[in-house]
């Protein structure tokens, strides 16, 4: 616990000293863009396509934070100038508070994945409220924000229970089942072969193979002109204001609820 508090104190001190760690570039309009260092590595045809018709996608990570893997992932995102969204589990936050502060400082989005990864589709309504609010309070106390978009565990919730949710809910368009495959190459190929503009990709920052896959996905898709943004940025770029209690697979695609 002492080591946990020391790490937290050091990171807070860095923030108080005003060291700006936010990394993914923004245009005048507030939209994320590929850093110039990466843009320079692309051939002229891809650069031209990117300028005329930019392609935005969102990487999302569930079930963390986990110090050993999430830290490596954040390092890789920082190096590549890529933004991501982390749907965190409240039980995982203890002793990892500094990782959440780092996520926010470096321009990532933090979302709610419930306190203990309960299956909301079958949970009692009081349990659902407790699971979401308990995690919200933890995140609010650490990050100083009020609202955290929700990803229901397993992506499952029904219409009746969705009425309890006071924020947008985020699903995905591509699920390479990284948690099951535990194979970075297969996960990478699944995503790269399926991806298109506006996709939301599901991964987990809990497994080393998933971190390896995520960074390889970024490398390969950035070379094709894709820009990695947070889910919130993706909605803003596409001009969509998400509604509370609605499950979105993408800004222009909602999931029907049972």
Predicted regions and their residues:
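Terminal accessory/targeting
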Residues: 1-58, 75-84, 196-258
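Bulky hydrophobic/aromatic packing residues
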Residues: 112, 149, 252-255
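Active-site beta->alpha N-cap acidic-glycine motif
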Residues: 30-123, 127-134, 138, 145-146
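Catalytic domains of cell-wall/extracellular-matrix polysaccharide-remodeling enzymes
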Residues: 72, 94, 118-227, 232-247
């Amino acid at each position: 616990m002492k080591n946990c508090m020391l790490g937290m104190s050091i990171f807070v001190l860095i923030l108080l000293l005003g060291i700006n760690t936010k990394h993914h570039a923004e245009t005048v309009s507030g939209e994320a863009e590929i850093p110039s260092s990466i843009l320079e590595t692309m051939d002229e045809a891809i650069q031209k396509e990117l300028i005329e018709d930019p392609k935005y996608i969102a990487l999302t990570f569930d079930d963390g934070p986990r110090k050993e893997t999430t830290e490596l992932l954040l390092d890789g995102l920082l190096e590549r100038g890529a933004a991501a969204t982390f749907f965190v589990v409240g039980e995982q936050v203890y002793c990892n508070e500094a990782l959440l502060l780092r996520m926010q400082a470096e321009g990532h989005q933090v979302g709610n994945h419930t306190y203990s990864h309960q299956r909301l589709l079958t949970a009692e309504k009081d349990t659902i409220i407790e699971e979401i609010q308990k995690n919200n309070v933890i995140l609010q106390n650490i990050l100083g924000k009020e609202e955290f978009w929700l990803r229901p565990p397993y992506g499952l919730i029904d219409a009746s229970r969705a009425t309890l949710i006071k924020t947008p809910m985020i699903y995905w368009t591509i699920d390479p089942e990284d948690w099951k495959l535990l194979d970075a190459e297969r996960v990478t190929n699944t995503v790269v072969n399926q991806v298109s503009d506006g996709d939301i990709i599901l991964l987990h920052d809990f497994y080393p193979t998933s971190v390896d896959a995520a960074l390889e996905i970024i490398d390969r898709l950035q070379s094709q002109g894709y820009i990695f943004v947070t889910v919130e940025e993706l909605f803003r770029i596409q001009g969509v204001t998400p509604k509370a209690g609605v499950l979105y697979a993408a800004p222009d695609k909602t999931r029907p609820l049972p």
